[in-house]
């Protein structure tokens, strides 16, 4: 098996461990590492709050909403599984039986799990917000691919507060936000 000429890391903006492992692998094997970073979508408006992590999101949500929609998936949501949030949180996540079982084992009631594949249109986000009487939506700053513009638009139109978890800082040796630029530069 031949070693690759270079590695392009196009993982999720919040997949830090995978990126760290790839950078270490590339450093060890002396292979060029290139990061494709999804472009961030500009997020502005009233009732939008930025936080650094899931714990800060939980703290902020305590004061913002009675009915919260987590659009973060099923990982690292422990701060929302405490007494303060019982009966208040709906978790939108991929329809993976293992992930659903994991949440059920943590005591999340089935009625609080929305297992569905996204990303979603503005109208689909609005339908979920209205169906569950959501007054606070929590998302990650995961860009267009993560459906962030549609989530923000839906929440704004319905007057729902939004908590956005900012992307974690990571010092990538080489990083691009344009797929075509990576292809053009590195295909030569």
What are the residue ranges of the model-derived segments?
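Redox-cofactor binding/interface segments in oxidoreductases and associated redox assembly factors
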Residues: 8-9, 70, 139
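Glycine/small-residue-rich loop that forms an oxyanion/phosphate-binding "nest" at active or ligand-binding sites
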Residues: 1-57
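Short, flexible loop segments at boundaries between secondary-structure elements
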Residues: 98-99, 161-173
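Short acidic-hydrophobic, aromatic-tinged amphipathic segments that line or gate anion-handling sites
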Residues: 48-55, 174-185
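Structural motif
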Residues: 5-6, 67, 135-136
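Active-site glycine-rich loop that binds ribose-phosphate moieties when present
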Residues: 49-63, 72-75, 120-122
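Anionic-ligand binding region
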Residues: 71-113
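A C-terminal functional module that forms or caps the active site or interfaces directly
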Residues: 104-127, 131-132, 136, 141-158, ...
């Amino acid at each position: 098996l031949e070693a690759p000429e270079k590695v392009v890391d196009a993982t999720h903006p919040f997949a830090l461990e995978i990126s760290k492992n790839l950078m270490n692998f590339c450093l060890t094997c002396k292979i060029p590492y290139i990061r494709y970073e999804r472009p961030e979508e500009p997020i502005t408006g009233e009732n939008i709050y930025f936080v650094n992590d899931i714990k800060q999101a939980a703290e902020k949500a305590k004061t913002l909403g009675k009915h919260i929609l987590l659009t973060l998936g099923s990982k690292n949501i422990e701060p929302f599984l405490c007494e303060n949030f019982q009966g208040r949180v709906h978790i939108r996540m991929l329809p993976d039986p293992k992930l659903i079982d994991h949440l059920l084992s943590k005591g999340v009631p089935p009625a609080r799990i929305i297992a569905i594949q996204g990303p979603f249109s503005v109208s689909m986000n609005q339908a979920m917000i209205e169906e569950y009487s959501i007054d606070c939506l929590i998302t990650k700053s995961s860009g267009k691919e993560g459906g962030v513009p549609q989530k923000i638009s839906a929440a704004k139109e319905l007057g729902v507060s939004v908590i956005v978890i900012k992307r974690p800082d990571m010092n990538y040796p080489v990083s691009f936000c344009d797929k075509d630029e990576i292809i053009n530069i590195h295909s030569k």
